[in-house]
Amino acid sequence: MDKYEYRVKTEQMLDHLEKKEYQQAKEIADGIDWRRVKNASMLNTVSEIYEYNGEFKKGRDILFLAFDRAPGSRKIVYRLGTLALKIKDIREATDCYEEFVKLAPKDPNQYILKYQILRTQGASLTDQITALEE
């Protein structure tokens, strides 16, 4: 696929996404080799498309590509953590949480991610509340 064809397809995909036509956006996304794309923001958007369609593992795989392109992005690390929870991979979510805290020690989203991990683990309500009160 050349650059022109890639640009046309991504514009169509983004138009469908804007109209909340997630299935059509996913069909276009399926036709693109995302390993060749260097734009982490575009990869993040494609991951969201797969997430909207309930394909969490595919979305996570695309996010890993984005993380390779932008390893210092706290947004990508946070989304990796939430997607890991959606596929019930608590260990990976915990790793993402630890990485997120290193990248953004003052970001309040770390407490939300910690709470989500505790809730998925079935921790006591007291522990969950404590995580949010921090």
Model regions and ranges:
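Register position in tetratricopeptide repeats
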Residues: 18-19, 52, 86-87, 120-121
